[in-house]
From Swiss-Prot:
It is a single-pass type IV membrane protein. Residues 1-24, 239-261 are annotated as: Disordered. The transmembrane domain is necessary for its oligomerization. The lineage of its organism: Eukaryota, Metazoa, Chordata, Craniata, Vertebrata. The record marks D141 as: Important for catalytic activity. This is Heme oxygenase 1. It comes from Bos taurus. One of its GO terms (biological process) is negative regulation of macroautophagy. Its main location: endoplasmic reticulum. A soluble form arises by proteolytic removal of the membrane anchor.
């Protein structure tokens, strides 16, 4: 009598099953407007401060629940506080971005609160689901997070020494690739029933959806603030701009002497026009390719 063959479409390892189960929501998170702008380097200091403050609240909640359950066999194999925990690093970043009284200054948005509440609920009532949240956060930080660090450093003109970006640095991990392999292998040793395993997979999707809601909220806040500070509503800016144009206007020339052009009197303007021409040329060339 032949034994029934296992369903080859369902990954046997938990790490692979998580990757497969979250593929669609992972793509949705990457395509959120906030993240698309981030990936393109269209990042403002205000937007970066907002997302970093949200991450601070999220990681405080996550790591408090991890500490609560560090001796619980449903999580113990994944307990790597020295290598992974982000709270101390985020506290450094909060001080950099918000100043010495940062605890009184950082925002706490509604989507962030919902994320925190879910982490607290899981840690206290269903600690086995912490695996899903640790997977989505820490492995993401060790992967795409390193790319985002470089983008933020360039877009915000941050020092190469890493101030303001401690969150993205893992000084106790020599090789991110090897550590991720170790972490996944530990995940695959966790013993759980098929029912618990499915709940872990579902919770990983929930974690991504919480991130998507956060990105949408942050983008909405930035968009609203941009509208509130529309330069078209700032007459003082128009007055100053008008005065600069007046300064560049040609003066009455002496008889018999040619009047210098605006460009010859304004080397900065001449440089900007030249640079604009070069950028347009490069853009057209790339489009043609």
């Amino acid at each position: 009598m032949e034994r029934p063959q296992p369903d080859s479409s369902m990954p046997q390892d938990l790490s692979e099953a998580l990757k497969e189960a979250t593929k669609e929501v992972h793509t949705q998170a990457e395509n959120a407007e906030f993240m698309k702008n981030f990936q393109k380097g269209e990042l403002t200091q205000e937007g970066f401060k907002l997302v970093m403050a949200s991450l601070y609240h999220i990681y405080v909640a996550l790591e408090e629940e991890i500490e609560r359950n560090k001796e619980n066999p449903v999580y113990t194999p994944l307990y790597f506080p020295e290598e992974l925990h982000r709270r101390a690093s985020l506290e450094q970043d909060m001080a950099f971005w918000y100043g010495p009284r940062w605890q009184e200054a950082i925002p706490y948005t509604q989507a962030t609160k919902r994320y925190v509440q879910r982490l607290q609920e899981v840690g206290r009532t269903e600690p086995e689901l912490l695996v899903a949240h640790a997977y989505t956060r820490y492995l993401g930080d060790l992967s795409g997070g390193q790319v985002l660090k470089k983008i933020a450093q360039k877009a915000l003109n941050l020092p190469s020494s890493g101030e303001g970006l401690a969150f993205f640095t893992f000084p106790n991990i020599a090789s991110a690739t090897k550590f991720k392999q170790l972490y996944r292998s530990r995940m695959n040793t966790l013993e759980m029933t098929p029912e618990v395993r499915q709940r872990v997979l579902d919770e990983a999707k929930t974690a991504f959806l919480l991130n998507i809601q956060l990105f949408e909220e942050l983008q909405g806040l930035l968009t609203q603030k941009a509208k509130d500070h529309d330069p078209l509503q700032a007459p003082e800016l128009h007055r100053r701009a008008g005065s600069k144009v007046q300064d560049l206007a040609p003066t009455k020339a002496s008889r018999g002497k040619p009047q210098p052009s605006v460009l010859s009197q304004a080397p900065l303007l001449r440089w900007v026009l030249t640079l604009s021409f070069l950028v347009a040329t490069v853009a057209v060339g790339l489009y043609a390719m």
